[in-house]
UniProtKB/Swiss-Prot annotation:
Active site positions, chain numbering: Y92 (for dna cleavage activity)
EC number: 2.7.7.-, 3.1.21.-, 3.6.1.-
Catalytic activity: ATP + H2O = ADP + phosphate + H(+)
Residue ranges annotated for the CRESS-DNA virus Rep endonuclease domain, each copy included: 6-105
Residues spanned by motif RCR-2: 53-55
InterPro entries: CRESS_DNA_REP, Helicase_SF3_ssDNA/RNA_vir, P-loop_NTPase
PROSITE patterns membership: CRESS_DNA_REP (PS52020)
Domain-related comment: There are 3 rolling circle replication (RCR) motifs. RCR-2 is probably involved in metal coordination. RCR-3 is required for phosphodiester bond cleavage for initiation of RCR.
Record-annotated disulphide pairs: none
Protein name per its UniProtKB record: Replication-associated protein
Species assigned in the record: Goose circovirus
Keywords: ATP-binding, Covalent protein-DNA linkage, DNA replication, DNA-binding, Endonuclease, Helicase, Host nucleus, Hydrolase, Metal-binding, Multifunctional enzyme, Nuclease, Nucleotide-binding, Nucleotidyltransferase, Transferase
Amino acid sequence: MAKNGNYSYKRWVFTINNPTFEDYCAVVEFCNLDNCKFAIVGEEKGEKEGTPHLQGFLSLRKNAKAAALEENLGGRAWLSRARGSDEDNEEYCSKESTYLRVGEPNRKGRSSDLPDAASDVLAGLPITDVARKYPTTYVMFGRGLERLRQLIVETARDWKTEVIVLIGRPGSGKSRYAFEFPAREKYYKSRGKWWDGYNGQDVVVMDDFYGWLPYDDLLRICDRYPLRVEYKGGMTQFVAKTLIITSNREPRDWYKCEFDVSALYRRINQYLILTPDGYAPAPEFMLPFKINY
């Protein structure tokens, strides 16, 4: 692409023939880590006529058009869209001598955003936010980033998860209540033992529950002690602050076996039933067992 093209790219190569002092100053001023992920500029001489020139490669943080970039480099640069990898361009621009080098190239098989993504994970940024911020890096290294979070960042639960149970007929607004419950992000637990996609969300929803988890597992989920839950390929800490369970049946009818369901009831913090004004706490006399103690 000629330098007068109206295209916008992040990766460019440039040549400045017979560079002046002002050209050197412009290149040095522009090639910094605020503008470039990686930049390398070499001093060369033409093979035929021996013309001195600067040969450079830029991997920019933001797309730039040729005209604007030419101005930033002093106004005399010939520009073209870069081809090949960062490493290929690094080798080409440093074949005679290297005048300037800033940042690090994107190595083959490695995302240049990986260190930043790892730093955000270590700082406690939720893994879903990391995925949104660095989608390509997450696609390539998501499992490793999640493992990093599990090993370094995760904390075990040492609080009582608040358990809210809603009992009502179909179509009475239980799922709507759970959907509108204030939370930055919720995790909807699917039927079965797997917790795929759970990444420490504060609110977990078990919608239309009727006993599809082992009873002892449910008791542990509703408790206050450290708990690791299983996803396909590993385990992670269960750290929900709130658990919302909706059902058409009362908890005492969730399991057919002879369990002591009072152990479940006492872990329930709020037991809500449908009233003319919406869902509200059930009167104590309506409950077969005492809750929240």
